[in-house]
């Protein structure tokens, strides 16, 4: 593939101008933007996420870069280093300032090995042991291409209701994908969150990946795990575990190793896992359509609503 000349020149300049872009190859898996593996004339390699069509929301690359930089401060956790980011801020005309991109360290991919799963547990435990004073984040960010509000609050059930579930429910209702009677069922659940999510309040804010599923686990060439595409904030650690279990999950060795080192409080499997997964199911309803509606309502029904 060949990058547009303006984009290639801007990247070469951002990297110091001493080397030229020799090759670019598409990398699969990009839902928000185009992705490519870059090779420079001095053999350095990088991962590029870019948007030429203006399809990605303004600020999305900046938000991801901030999450990756925060993950990079966690000892024992591997994530790609941020090399450069060029983005429009929210409210700016997307594309008005030229190409937008996120340039990252290239992490050579490999295959999972027996040590991958306990190592992933150790990495996630290190992340979750990075605690905050409140639930939320320094700025709003995104889940997929959808806005994610992170205004800080001290009460976890309120955060999950007002910053996560209610905005996605409102969007689904406005789009006609959830009807009024189904909305009432959600509202009855919301009234119970103070009691049902008390464990999150008790354990306090942990630094989260925020979108932890198998597609955002990158196994390195030696089998070590790295985390990519974060949507970070401070929340209840169980949110990451619940999301990881929503679409197949990781190897059971990962969960056993995590639970051995930091057991979950009672009520996770029966209640809190479903409440946390509801957020991601509503996100899928809003991103991909009513095909996820049935599973979303089934999860709500499993909670008694």
Locations of regions flagged by a protein language model:
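ATP-binding pocket architecture of kinase catalytic cores
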Residues: 26-158
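Short helix/strand-capping connector loops at secondary-structure junctions
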Residues: 275-284
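Short acidic/polar mixed-charge low-complexity motifs
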Residues: 18, 42-44, 224
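Regulatory N- and C-terminal appendages and interdomain linkers associated
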Residues: 1-23, 94-99, 284-305
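Short Pro/Gly-enriched beta-strand edge/turn motifs at strand-loop
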Residues: 15-22, 63-65, 198-200
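Active-site Asp-x-Gly
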Residues: 152-161, 170, 203-207, 214-271, ...
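An alpha-helical support segment within catalytic cores of ATP-dependent transferases
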Residues: 3-15, 132-207
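A general structural signal marking secondary-structure boundaries and capping sites
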Residues: 18, 75, 128-135, 172, ...
């Amino acid at each position: 593939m060949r990058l547009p000349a303006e984009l290639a020149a801007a990247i070469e300049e951002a990297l110091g101008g001493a080397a030229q872009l020799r090759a670019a190859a598409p990398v699969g898996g990009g839902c928000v933007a185009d992705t490519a593996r870059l090779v420079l004339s001095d053999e350095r390699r990088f991962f590029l996420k870019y948007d030429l069509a203006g399809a990605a929301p303004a600020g999305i690359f900046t938000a991801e870069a901030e999450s990756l930089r925060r993950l990079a401060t966690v000892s024992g956790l591997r994530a790609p280093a941020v090399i450069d980011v060029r983005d429009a801020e929210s409210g700016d005309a997307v594309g008005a300032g030229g190409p937008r991109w996120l340039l990252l360290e290239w992490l050579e991919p490999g295959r999972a090995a027996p040590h991958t799963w306990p190592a992933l547990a150790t990495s996630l435990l290190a992340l979750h042991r990075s605690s905050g004073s409140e639930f939320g984040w320094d700025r709003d960010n995104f889940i997929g291409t959808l806005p994610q509000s992170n205004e800080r609050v001290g009460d976890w059930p309120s955060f999950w209701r007002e910053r996560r579930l209610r905005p996605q429910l409102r969007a689904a209702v406005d789009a006609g994908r959830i009807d009024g009677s189904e909305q009432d069922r959600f509202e009855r659940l919301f009234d119970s969150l103070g009691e049902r999510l008390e464990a999150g309040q008790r354990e306090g804010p942990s630094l989260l990946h925020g979108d932890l599923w198998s597609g955002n686990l990158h196994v390195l060439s030696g089998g070590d795990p790295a985390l990519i595409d974060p949507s970070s904030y401070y929340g209840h650690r169980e949110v990451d575990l619940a999301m990881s279990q929503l679409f197949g999950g990781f190897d059971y060795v990962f969960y056993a190793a995590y639970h051995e080192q930091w057991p979950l409080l009672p009520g996770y499997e029966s209640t809190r896992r479903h409440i946390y997964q509801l957020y991601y199911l509503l996100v899928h309803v809003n991103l991909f359509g009513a095909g996820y509606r049935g599973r979303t309502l089934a999860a709500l029904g499993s909670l008694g609503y």
